[in-house]
Amino acid sequence: MRIAAELGLPLLTVVDTAGAALNREAEEGGLAGEIARCLADMVTLPAPTLCLLLGQGAGGAALALLPADRVLAARHAWLSPLPPEGASAILYRTTERAYETADRQGVRSADLLAHGIVDRIVEEEPQDAAGEGPERPEHPSRDDAFLARLGATLGAELAALRAQDQAERLAARRARHRRIGLPG
């Protein structure tokens, strides 16, 4: 982040993590403090920022990379402070209700878009992007068409961010992240 600020380069964060360890050693090692510092740095960074939620985003480490000017998500990406399995285990004392818990948490990319956490969803599969197409590839995230759509989308978003006035962009970023979690 410091280098992006010093050189005036945009910063792209990519979130695809199962999350940090939820144990005593992680807490004693200062994980919570590092997450807090990262959140503060991301919100105040003068450089244009773009976050890509590429796969799973679980825990504070994923949330720490989220406060960007714009947030994009792959169609099948999700974000949660606690994985649905963990939340299900806490709420119901079983992980068998993880799907129901995920639905209630609103962790899917479409839910995140509806709540203003994600700005844009990039379709992963050709049939999702064009309304038709071949069967699901074995590794949809490695599909050339998806990568082309993703690259074009990232390029367009970064160009738009770089064209914005810095003070206006920073004010909008701060306002955006103050609203997250508020009703209406």
How would you label these PLM feature ranges?
Residues 5, 113, 178:
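Short polybasic/polar patches that bind polyanions
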Residues 144, 148-184:
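Intrinsically disordered, low-complexity segments enriched in small/flexible residues
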Residues 15-151, 155, 163:
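Conserved catalytic cores of soluble enzyme domains
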Residues 1-22:
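A structural preference for short, pocket-lining loop segments at secondary-structure junctions
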